[in-house]
Amino acid sequence: MSIHPFDSAIELAHEAPDRWHGRTSEDYWNMVSPYGGATAGAMMQAMLRHPERRGTPLSFTLNFLAPIERGEFAIDTELVRANRNSQHWAVRLAQGGKVLAQAIAICATRRETWGKVEAERPDVPPAEQCAVAPPRKPDGFLQRYEFRIVRGKPFAVN
């Protein structure tokens, strides 16, 4: 079985309990830096693989401080505080010793509870009746998507 390009993009090598190494992926390269979802995925992957992590992620807030260059990067994870049911994490991505992205996350052991979400599909025509938008930039992760415009002009005030 072949590995999905996203799994390759967030693949990390473990150096120490709190340190991971990865490499940017051309498959998820955006205009000046990697697609934010690939960066967030790699950073969350480091936290999820940490030997002290318990529970599942409840929140993950990522701040991009500067563009990430093509090539290798390091991710450091820090368990800032833990109690019986939750953990608070800090995750930092750096290149050349400079932090370029930082995240805070909360993981928790979920308890069984009642919940109900009511959502309705918006009133739109079938996809095949919508015009295909031309790609803005034919590289990286945008090649994986076909954008269809329901109404208005893309990238213009409607």
Language-model regions, residue ranges each:
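Terminal targeting signals and extreme-terminal segments of soluble enzymes
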Residues: M1-N158
